[in-house]
Structures are given as structure tokens and as C-alpha cells.
């Protein structure tokens, strides 16, 4: 779970990690004691000194040892207790990448301007890949070795988008499942400032301008194919009931791992 100054949210987030799962919190230069608090609550702490959401996420991915890894923000907006639901289709072999589709629990959880920006991003993603997704939320699950084979290069705000774009280019089976989205604890590190918003827009634009196959090992997955150069369709997983956002990583024995982060 990528973490930058989330001391206030970490105790609740880590207490919600499913039994038997191992949380990996990647500290990205916190000054509020987040790393110490994470360790006190049983997390394995990794330090990623180079600032950036993608840098923290990728450090967690490299530190993971489980076959299946899950990403989740650690700001309290997403509930790690729901990670088994998100990881389930991957563990069962029914999907290669599962994304948690955020369902706001209150108006304050997801303001209109943020929802509109997410909708526009989904439209641009469809134009680029053919995928029809409702959300590119931070809670997600995939197999570790498959993610490493995508050779993700973005180390800032474009990392989650690049993961989806390159997975689509490799013909992965991508599904969505609904997760509850609550107001975060503390200030957003990305959209909480104009500078952060600008960097996010810049990073994501660069990812969308990538050509298929740019800078990665081409590992295509068997499964859903493409129609007319675009994804034939993304499936909607329908059995989830809850979810949230934060920075960290956890593993269920040798079967699954979770990386959660909120910036």
C-alpha cells in the first residue's frame, strides 16, 4: 500500500486487512510517523524515497511474494476487508485484472468535478483501447508476474492508468466489481492542489498517447478477444458488497497479496 502522510488513517485501514493476509505499506517520504504506525500495526514496511504514486506502487509490487497482488489506497476511503472479493475472480482464473468500481457513500466522498474527470478519462480510455469501464479506481487485483511482464514505466500519477492500458493491449480479461467509496481521511496528495491535478493530467495524457507495445514485453493473455481493434467487452463482477481507498500491500498466505495506497 503506497503511503504518504497517512498516520491518521493507517490504524483503521490496517485493522481491516483480512485475516491471513500480509499488508505491505510503502512509505513514500512521510513526515508524520506513518512508517512507524504501519509497523506497529503489523505491516511490512518498504521505503520508496523517490516521490511518486507509481514509484510507491511499483516498490510494493516488487516487494510482494504472493502470486496474486491487490492494490488499495490507505486513506480510509476504501475498505481493505473487501479485497478478497476483488481478488476472487483472479484467484479463480475468471479474470486477469479486477478493478473496484467506486460507489460513493456520501456526496462528499466523490465531488462532481472529480466524477466528471473520471468519466472523461474512461471515455478517453475507450477511444484508446476499446475498453468500456466506468471507473479506474485504485482498488484492484492481478497476478504479480503478469503485472511485472507489462513493464510499467510511469512512476507518478499515470501508473494505475498505464496498468489498464497495457493490460488491454495484451488482451487481458478485465472486470469491474462495485466497492463502496467513503470520504478520505486527510487531504488528497493528487487532486488536493492545482499542482497535483496538473501533474496527474500530464501523466495520464502521456500514458494515453502510448502506442500499443511501447516500451514493454508483449505478454498477451488468452481470453476475451478484440473486435475491430478494440476490446470486445469488459465483464461486470456482480457479487461485491463493499470497498474503499488507501496506500499499502497485503498477501493471503502464498495465494494473494494486497498493495493499497492513497495519494
Pin down the residues of each PLM region.
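Acceptor/aglycone-binding surface of glycosyltransferases and processive sugar-polymer synthases
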Residues: 49-51, 55-62, 80-157, 184-194, ...
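Hydrophobic helical membrane-anchoring modules
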Residues: 130, 152-263
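Short beta-strand/loop segment that forms part of the nucleotide-sugar
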Residues: 1, 13-14, 21-29, 46
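Short aromatic/hydrophobic "clamp" motif used to bind/position activated sugar donors
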Residues: 69
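A conserved acidic beta->alpha catalytic loop
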Residues: 27-35, 76
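Donor nucleotide-sugar binding loop of glycosyltransferases
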Residues: 6-9, 30, 53, 79
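Conserved donor nucleotide-binding strand/loop of the catalytic core
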Residues: 24, 35-63
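Acidic helix N-cap motif at the loop->helix transition within catalytic regions
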Residues: 8-12, 32-41
Amino acid at each position: 500500500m503506497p503511503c504518504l502522510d497517512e498516520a491518521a488513517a493507517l490504524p483503521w485501514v490496517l485493522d481491516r486487512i483480512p485475516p491471513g493476509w500480509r499488508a505491505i505499506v510503502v512509505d513514500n517520504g512521510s513526515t508524520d510517523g506513518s512508517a512507524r504506525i504501519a509497523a506497529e500495526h503489523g505491516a511490512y514496511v518498504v521505503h520508496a524515497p523517490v516521490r511518486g504514486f507509481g514509484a510507491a506502487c511499483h516498490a510494493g509490487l516488487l516487494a510482494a511474494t504472493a502470486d496474486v497482488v491487490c492494490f488499495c489506497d490507505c486513506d480510509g476511503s476504501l475498505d481493505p476487508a473487501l479485497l478478497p472479493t476483488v481478488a476472487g475472480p483472479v484467484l479463480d482464473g475468471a479474470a486477469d485484472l479486477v478493478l473496484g468500481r467506486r460507489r460513493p457513500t456520501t456526496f462528499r466522498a466523490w465531488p462532481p468535478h472529480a466524477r466528471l474527470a473520471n468519466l472523461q478519462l474512461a471515455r478517453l480510455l475507450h477511444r484508446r483501447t476499446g475498453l468500456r469501464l466506468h471507473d479506474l479506481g485504485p482498488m484492484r487485483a492481478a497476478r504479480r508476474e503478469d503485472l511485472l511482464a507489462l513493464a510499467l514505466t510511469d512512476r507518478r500519477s499515470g501508473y494505475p492508468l498505464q496498468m489498464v492500458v497495457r493490460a488491454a493491449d495484451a488482451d487481458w480479461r478485465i472486470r469491474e466489481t462495485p466497492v463502496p467509496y467513503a470520504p478520505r481521511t486527510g487531504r488528497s496528495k493528487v487532486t488536493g492542489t492545482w499542482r497535483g491535478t496538473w501533474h496527474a493530467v500530464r501523466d495520464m495524457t502521456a500514458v494515453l498517447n502510448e502506442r500499443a507495445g511501447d516500451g514493454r514485453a508483449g505478454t498477451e493473455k488468452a481470453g476475451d478477444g478484440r473486435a475491430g481493434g478494440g476490446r470486445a467487452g469488459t465483464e461486470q463482477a456482480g457479487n461485491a458488497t463493499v470497498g474503499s481507498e488507501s496506500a499499502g500491500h497485503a498477501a493471503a498466505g502464498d495465494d494473494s497479496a494486497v498493495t493499497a495506497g492513497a495519494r
